[in-house]
């Protein structure tokens, strides 16, 4: 199990990393393929973030999946915790973990709202281009800068 800590949260995941590459892992209940609204394939995994002071309070998740030939990130925040900076805090911590613990070089995001786009941009993702299947959506890309 991997653990990530931020100033307000603890994130936990059963992701599997072998030789720097993400492998299939146990996925949290409730993760859906948002484009076809069907249960995920099992190649997905996520970090669930909980309140440090109330470990039963689930705040948000950052998910990762291999789809459309790309490693994609998805995320969501529980309603009571929205617009309080939790998602950006979790995504920044996840990106640091991802860069440190994998040898992957590119991570893709496909935001579904202005708020999601804003979070990706604040975390260093750059606009890439329109989504091939729906030109009303756009790809954003995060390139790892390793030292």
PLM ranges: what are they?
Residues 83-88:
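Glycine-rich acyl-CoA binding loop
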Residues 120:
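Conserved active-site tyrosine of GNAT-family acetyltransferases
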Residues 1-80, 92-115, 126-147:
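GNAT-family acyltransferases
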